[in-house]
Design a protein with these regions (language model features):
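Conserved Rossmann-fold SDR core element
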Residues: 35-37, 116, 126-140, 182-189
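Active-site loop of short-chain dehydrogenase/reductase
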Residues: 7-8, 35-37, 80-95, 128-130, ...
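C-terminal substrate-recognition "lid" of short-chain dehydrogenase/reductases
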Residues: 166-189, 194-195
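Short-chain dehydrogenase/reductase
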Residues: 1-33, 46-48, 54
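Catalytic loop of short-chain dehydrogenase/reductase
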Residues: 82-114, 119-127, 139
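Amphipathic alpha-helical dimer-interface segment in Rossmann-like NAD(P)H-dependent oxidoreductases
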Residues: 27, 65-85, 123-124, 128, ...
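Catalytic Tyr-X3-Lys loop
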Residues: 37, 45, 52-72, 91, ...
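Conserved mid-core segment of classical short-chain dehydrogenase/reductases
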Residues: 23, 45-61, 79, 104-107, ...
Length: 206
C-alpha cells in the first residue's frame, strides 16, 4: 500500500520486551532511511487478569511490552534528533479505559496508565527536541474471543454509536505529528466511550 502511494516502506522486527533489542531498533531504522522524525508506539501485549488473578509475572510482561519500550524508543529518538539538530514527535497509543476504569485487564490497564504518566514526563524532559503525545482509542479491532457480532455491538456502545477505526487513529496520530505546538497531551478517539462508565470491559458487555 505504501509503495503504491509512492512511499518507501520497510519492515523491522524486534522483541521489544528485550531491552537490548528495543535500544537497537531505532538505530537500525536510521541506518536504512538516514533519518527518523517520529516514533509511534503502537506495539502492545493484551492479556487478561483482574484483582483476583493478578501476578508479578503478568504485570512484568505487560510493563516490558507496553511501557518500557516506549520510553526507550523516545530516548533513542531524542538522541538522534539532538545529533541532527532537528525536532520530532513521539505518539504513544494508550486506551480510553484510563478515563473509564473497570477491574478487567488489570495489568494491561496499569501498564497503559504508566505510559500515560510517562507521556507527560517525557514531554517535559525531552523538550524542545521531542514532543510527546498520546492517542487513546476505543474498541477498534476484534480481540480475545470476540466474534464479529459481538465486536459490532461493542463498537456501537458509545454516545456516537461508533467507536474508533484504524483510519480514525491514523488521522489523530498524523495530526499530532504535524502539530508543532502540541505536546504532553492525549487525544481520546473513541466515539465518546470514555464518557460512559461501565462495570466491566466492553467486550464482556456486548
Amino acid at each position: 500500500d505504501c509503495a503504491a502511494l509512492g512511499a518507501r516502506a520497510l519492515t523491522f522486527q524486534a522483541d521489544l520486551s528485550d531491552e537490548a533489542a528495543a535500544r537497537a531498533l531505532l538505530p537500525a531504522v536510521v541506518q536504512a532511511f538516514g533519518a527518523v522524525d517520529a516514533v509511534v508506539n503502537n506495539a502492545s501485549d493484551f492479556e487478561y487478569d483482574d484483582p483476583g488473578s493478578f501476578s508479578y509475572a503478568l504485570m512484568e510482561r505487560q510493563w516490558r511490552a507496553n511501557t518500557a519500550p516506549a520510553i526507550v524508543l523516545a530516548q533513542a529518538l531524542h538522541e538522534h534528533l539532538q545529533a541532527r539538530g532537528a525536532t520530532g514527535c513521539v505518539v504513544n497509543l494508550l486506551d480510553q479505559k484510563l478515563w473509564n476504569q473497570n477491574p478487567d485487564y488489570l495489568s494491561h490497564t496499569l501498564s497503559k496508565a504508566a505510559l500515560e504518566a510517562a507521556t507527560t514526563m517525557l514531554a517535559m524532559g525531552l523538550a524542545p527536541a521531542v514532543r510527546v503525545c498520546g492517542v487513546a482509542p476505543g474498541v477498534t479491532l476484534l480481540s480475545g474471543a470476540m466474534e464479529d457480532g459481538e465486536f459490532e455491538a461493542a463498537h456501537r456502545m458509545t454516545p456516537l454509536r461508533r467507536s474508533s477505526t484504524p483510519e480514525d487513529i491514523a488521522r489523530a496520530v498524523r495530526f499530532l505529528i504535524e502539530s508543532p505546538a502540541i505536546t504532553g497531551t492525549t487525544l481520546l478517539v473513541d466515539g465518546g466511550q470514555h464518557l460512559q462508565a461501565q462495570p466491566r470491559d466492553v467486550m464482556f458487555l456486548a
